[in-house]
């Protein structure tokens, strides 16, 4: 039973991402109960102790404890951060074989508890593992969400804000597709306030166009740069996960770029991929189909084809 009748989030995987996510939840007052599950039980116990010692500084009361899969029964949201990490030189897709086996065990254990909530997947390759979570869980696809390109979009908005000297909150631009090497920027629908970005740089010549391309490359390759410097990325994605969690638990109907299931939109079917979607307490209310130009359409189809190729290999063995 729930301790206080409030919103319960179960976090599976108390590594860098999982612990940073719990820290973000706690500091933003998003959840009422947070349960930590990790294969290394000692780590989960230690983290729960550490977080509880900081409860006096939190903006609202929160119950935090280390638990097991039985705690998923009454959870509103299970967030999966567990799995093998990306090493220097590895792509996110290199992690498929290692992590699908881990996910089958995790998801089946969660469902055996009687879980009836939503899944949020953070582990890479996130689009593939969100699809795997959906398959293994048997839940409707709208109740299984991946972090998708939420962090890529945040990086994009940050770098564009720096370039144009405006707050990133006033940059309206999206990265869609695979959370990985085939992702793409939607320049045709990118705005600073109400001004199209392409129009803003028109008069600045070819060098400004090259600047925009460099910004995208820095977005796409950011994880590689961070991993090379400090071994892993976790703060940015933790804050992105907290944002999705708030949209779910507070029933916000917020539009966020998550990994969502496509069943005809964007001309694609049977794939989870990063697209803008409306998120509320029921999960993905709807996917928003952006009007893409021909080049963007081709790049998006290439990204989807890359993911489908990996899925075909992973699920036919």
UniProtKB/Swiss-Prot annotation:
Its main location: cytoplasm. SUPFAM superfamilies: LDH C-terminal domain-like, NAD(P)-binding Rossmann-fold domains. GO terms for cellular component: cytoplasm. The keyword Cytoplasm applies. NCBIfam families: L-LDH-NAD, PRK00066.1, PRK06223.1. Pathway: Fermentation; pyruvate fermentation to lactate; (S)-lactate from pyruvate: step 1/1. Its EC number is 1.1.1.27. It comes from the Bacteria. Transmembrane segments: none annotated. This is L-lactate dehydrogenase. Belongs to the LDH/MDH superfamily. LDH family. It is an enzyme of class 1 (oxidoreductase). Beta-D-fructose 1,6-bisphosphate binds at residues 157, 169-172. NAD(+) binds at residues 16-17, 38, 43, 69, 83-84, 105, 122-124, 147. The keyword Phosphoprotein applies. Catalyzes the conversion of lactate to pyruvate. The active site is at residue 179. It is found in: Cytoplasm. The modification Phosphotyrosine is found at residue 224. Signal peptide: none annotated. GO terms for biological process: glycolytic process; lactate metabolic process. Coiled coil: none annotated. It catalyses: (S)-lactate + NAD(+) = pyruvate + NADH + H(+).
């Amino acid at each position: 039973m729930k301790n206080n009748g409030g919103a319960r989030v179960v976090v599976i995987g108390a590594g860098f991402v999982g612990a940073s996510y719990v820290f973000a939840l706690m500091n933003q007052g998003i959840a009422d109960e947070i349960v930590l599950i990790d294969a290394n039980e000692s780590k989960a116990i230690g983290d729960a102790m550490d977080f509880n010692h900081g409860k006096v500084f939190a903006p609202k009361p929160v119950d935090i404890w280390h638990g097991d899969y039985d705690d998923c029964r009454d959870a509103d949201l299970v967030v999966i951060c567990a799995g093998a990490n990306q090493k220097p030189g590895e792509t996110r897709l290199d992690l498929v074989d290692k992590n699908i086996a881990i996910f089958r065990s995790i998801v089946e254990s969660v469902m055996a508890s009687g879980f009836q909530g939503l899944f949020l997947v953070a582990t890479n390759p996130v689009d593939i593992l969100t699809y795997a979570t959906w398959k293994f869980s048997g839940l409707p696809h709208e109740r299984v969400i991946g972090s998708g390109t939420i962090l890529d979009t945040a990086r994009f908005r940050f770098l564009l804000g720096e370039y144009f000297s405006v707050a990133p909150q006033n940059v309206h631009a999206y990265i869609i597709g695979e959370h990985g090497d085939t992702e793409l920027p939607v320049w045709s629908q990118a705005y600073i306030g109400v001004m199209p970005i392409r129009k803003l740089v028109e008069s600045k010549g070819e060098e400004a166009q090259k600047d925009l391309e460099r910004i995208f490359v820095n977005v796409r390759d950011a994880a590689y740069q961070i991993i090379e410097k400090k071994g892993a990325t976790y703060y940015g994605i933790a804050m992105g996960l907290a944002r999705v969690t708030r949209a779910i638990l507070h029933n916000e109907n917020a539009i966020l770029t998550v990994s969502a299931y496509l069943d005809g939109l964007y001309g694609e079917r049977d794939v989870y991929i990063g697209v803008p979607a409306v998120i509320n307490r029921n999960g993905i209310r709807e996917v928003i189909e952006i009007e893409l130009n021909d080049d963007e359409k081709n790049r998006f189809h290439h990204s989807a084809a890359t993911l489908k190729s990996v899925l075909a290999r992973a699920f036919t063995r």
